[in-house]
């Protein structure tokens, strides 16, 4: 289908725009930009150099994609923001491109970023993530597939959040949040296994029980976290989910969030 592009939009002729794209008045699109098929760009959106957008994305009013990183190390190098397919950016979202030459900020497929969310430079976001109103993710973070952030969450630089974890509203955290759990509070603490989401994903009951047993060893045991990992390997039946937990904890550089 033909594109529907307002003559009041400001679009650099070098920008690569796919098929069946709708661009509303007063959108601003720079030249080093790729926009896939079936995207909708609302009024007053800025799509800036280095942005590579997949198919079927929706970008609402006043959002800025590919903004220069808010990082004193940035020297004007050519960097990118990579956006997957069917991503929704609601009003006033800001996503920065990477800092150093050749670097990328990445947003996976089918993510949903609510009003006022901000994803900073060099952060990597997996698919199917949700970012609530006003949530701010600092630079160099790693967000796993299906992670859910409630409103007004602040993730400090370089933290990791595991697959299908949920961060409760108003939480600020500076340590890693392992997969499949709920975390919240001040200071942030473990709040149990995210059974609601695991049920939604149709994870078997025995797998959910194994996940709960693994985290019982980590958060309720009397040993160090890394001794708890050894106990998980010895006591909890193996599965991809258990391996995900083990590998995540072994890979932490900042440490994981507090015990109860």
Regions found by a protein language model. Give the residues of each.
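Structural signal for interior beta-strand "rungs" in well-ordered beta-sheet cores
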Residues: 4-184, 188-189
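Terminal amphipathic alpha-helical/low-complexity segments used for targeting or macromolecular assembly
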Residues: 1-8, 13-14, 19-20, 56, ...
């Amino acid at each position: 289908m033909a594109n529907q592009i307002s003559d009041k939009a400001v679009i650099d002729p070098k920008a690569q725009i796919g098929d069946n794209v709708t661009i509303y008045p007063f959108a601003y699109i720079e030249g080093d930009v790729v926009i896939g098929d079936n995207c909708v760009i609302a009024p007053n959106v800025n799509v800036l150099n280095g942005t590579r957008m997949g198919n079927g994305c929706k970008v609402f009013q006043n959002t800025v994609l590919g903004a220069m990183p808010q990082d004193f190390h940035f020297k004007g190098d050519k960097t990118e923001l990579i956006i997957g397919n069917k991503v929704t950016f609601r009003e006033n979202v800001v996503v920065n491109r990477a800092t150093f030459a050749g670097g990328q900020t990445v947003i996976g497929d089918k993510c949903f970023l609510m009003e006022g969310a901000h994803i900073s430079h060099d952060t990597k976001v997996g698919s199917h993530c949700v970012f609530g109103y006003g949530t701010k993710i600092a630079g160099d973070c790693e967000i796993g597939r299906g992670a859910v952030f409630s409103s007004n969450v602040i993730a400090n630089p370089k933290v990791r959040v595991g697959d299908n974890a949920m961060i409760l509203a108003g939480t600020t955290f500076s340590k890693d949040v392992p997969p499949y759990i709920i975390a919240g509070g001040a200071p942030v603490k473990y709040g149990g296994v995210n059974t609601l989401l695991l049920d939604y994903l149709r994870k078997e009951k025995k797998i959910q029980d194994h996940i709960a047993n693994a985290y019982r060893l980590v958060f309720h045991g009397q040993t160090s976290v890394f001794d708890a990992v050894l106990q998980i390997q010895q006591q909890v039946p193996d599965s991809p989910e258990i391996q995900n937990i083990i590998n995540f904890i072994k890979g932490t550089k900042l440490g994981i969030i507090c015990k109860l």
